[in-house]
Amino acid sequence: MKYFFVLGINPTLSLAELAAVFNHGELTLAQKNIAILETDQKIEANIIKKIGGTIKFGLIHDKTASLMAQDILKSIATFSKPEKIETKFKFGISFYGKAKVNLKILGMEFKKRLLQSGIPSRWVVSREPTLSSVVVEQNKLTTAQGAEIVIIQFDKKLFLGKTIAVQPFKELSFRDYGRPARDDYSGMLPPKLAQIMINLALASSPCQGEGRGEVILDPFCGSGTILTEAMLMGYKNLIGADISDRALQDTKANIGWIEKSYELRDVSYELFHSDATKISKCLAANSVDAIITEPYLGPQRGKLEIEKIIKELEELYSRSLMEFKKILKTNGRVVMVWPVFTLSLRGSASDRSNLPSLSLRATGGSEAISRMPSLAGSLNPNLNGFTIINPIPASLQKNIFINLTARRTMVYGREQQKVWREIVVLEK
């Protein structure tokens, strides 16, 4: 079976997540934001709730080398027509590619064929050649009463498929903005990024079913985003620690809110006050399967003395990694965020001359790095024996759309942000 995945705003990060989750299959990057997975395993619709980097996914049913509407129509009619209809059938068409495919003729002819079969229909259209996940969700195109037909141009062919599920944007927004305890001043990790980090730390996590026994630690738990997302992904043994009493209170409140909102049962979690640089005093050696965390990233407001901040954070992270190595199991992973300061934080070039820069790997291509700001002020903590893992499969590492740093990490952020996130995967 072949599945397609429409990737999020950071395709490299999204692809790395898919490679970790679906390590039993063969991944191909069809376009900058389209991945194709060939696998023997059936992928259920609810997987979309556990992979943060995918906007929509579906099953590829056929392929054709023809650009003619009639040839495409003949194929999509075999897998897109409903078996039984109770109300007016809704359908939409999304085309990912640069070829000239007449979507208007295709949509009108498909609507005509449905009517000839006694099926009244409504064609859902958009100004763009692709339908957003919001449009797909609002028009119920992933239900039995609808369909989003997806056409992907790749390798001189058109791959024809149907969307199975789209990212649950309402739920993600609810968890991000509806939580009872938020600390906007110290920063908030987006739930989608938390899911990606969890999957990078524990390969194939959503595919293993509920009730997994791995022990997950977040030693800078903040308001508990990583822990609550791990709960929703089926993990049952969670540990959170922080040096801030308020952070622990916020985490406890948010965990309780998630448990009540989603009616979760049998989740074991422990919260305790601890400095991350002394956490081995609280946990046994080799007792933790994965450490996933966004540590303190430095002050986010006011005039920043970047050189001083970098020095302080490097000391904090180096000492923390030394402790993590004591409590983490052999081959266990640490997935953490390191801050990357953009050049917009400083004035003249002379002000920035002493900042260590973070170079993006040249094989990422100009298209891959075009949206990146000028990055500088990156950290280089002592890894204390940990190894940085390249999360991209070897077969895709030279793809022109892959955007890694020179040290094989990924950078995440938006153009207006002064501090970006560097996602680092470490292995013991």
Model-identified regions with their sequence ranges:
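Intrinsic-disorder-associated, low-complexity terminal segments enriched in Asp/Asn/His/Tyr and depleted
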Residues: 266, 351-354, 380-382
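Non-catalytic nucleic-acid substrate-recognition regions in nucleic-acid-modifying enzymes
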Residues: 6-7, 16-147
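S-adenosylmethionine
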Residues: 271-342, 380-416
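Short strand-turn motif at the edge of the Rossmann-like AdoMet-binding core
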Residues: 3, 7-8, 337-340
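Conserved S-adenosyl-L-methionine
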Residues: 190-203, 210, 214-262, 268-278, ...
